[in-house]
Amino acid sequence: KTEHYEMVLKAGDMERCLPKLAYHLEEPRVGQSYPNYYAAQLASKFVKVVLSGAGGDELFGGYPWRYYRAVVNNDFEHYVDKYYSFWQRLIPNTEIKNVFAPIWDDVKDVWTRDIFRDIFLTHKNELNTPEDYINHSLYFEAKTFLHGLLVVEDKISMSHSMETRVPFLDNDLVDFAMKCPVNLKLNNLTDVVRINENETGGKKKKYFQKTNDGKQILRNVMKNYVPNSIVKGQKQGFSSPDASWFKGESIDFVKTKLFNGHTPLYDYLDRDSVEKLVNQHLDGDVNRRLFIWSLLNFEECCHIYE
């Protein structure tokens, strides 16, 4: 038997949480993590040790719409370009030099594409089958994205005097997952490979959005223990509607933090370029929620550690 607790977060909760969150994380983070902060706050009222599901997605293919984008390319370098383009979406490539103008001389030789590529230096990079592309993506996310999640998980739980344990990252289970065939993780790979690339919108609509594909082996294992609606459910992220908050309830908060004349942000970033990108979101033209959250987080860190 389990007991379930519900906490409803509003835009103001994000605003109030930001100083404490930035302090405990000790460094700027791109991913929003205030829902995690409030979940830890609630759990700490009842327990001192919690179990986390971190690692389940990265080991068993929980983000198929990401992997499928780069699954039918010609070679390793093409694969890197395609997969990198998905991850490097915080700032448009055409705007990077403008945004970092105040410190451009210091960062112009830092090529994130090369850093991205170097993750695979110790990995076998022969890409002969669609499964090879998928395994490359899973390897990359386990080596990078997962590490960031674990940092947040650990620091936020410790800020509430709790310990988080991650059963999916048990050594034996990780070894098993790394050897597990792709067809036990993803159901739609065969269809993705065969789809007509010239079919208008077909691939994007079917496979680049959230579906009930992914983590198939976990779904099969648990089908006798949890409701069918969960076994066949779509991937549900642990996030809040900040995209709408930033241009709605929190619009004044965003403008006050990012558009004021005293923020230390613009010792490092170009004001006009940043404001242009932020306004694209506030005007409803482009979803730049991750960019705005990154700016808010960085701005708060500047105040804490200046």
Language model features by range: what are they?
Residues 1-24, 106-124:
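A conserved beta-strand->alpha-helix junction
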Residues 45, 49, 86-306:
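Adenosyl-5′-phosphate
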Residues 27-29, 208-209:
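Acceptor-substrate binding/catalytic loop of class I
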Residues 13-14, 58-62, 67, 154, ...:
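Short catalytic/ligand-binding loop motif for oxyanion handling, primarily in non-cytosolic enzymes
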Residues 19-23, 65-68, 245-247:
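Short low-complexity, flexible loop/linker segments enriched in glycine and/or proline
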Residues 28-40, 79-85, 197, 260-265:
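Short, basic, helix/turn surface patches
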Residues 60-86:
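A mobile, often basic/glycine-rich helix-loop segment
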Residues 1-19, 31-53, 146, 222, ...:
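ATP-dependent adenylation/nucleotidyltransferase module used to activate substrates
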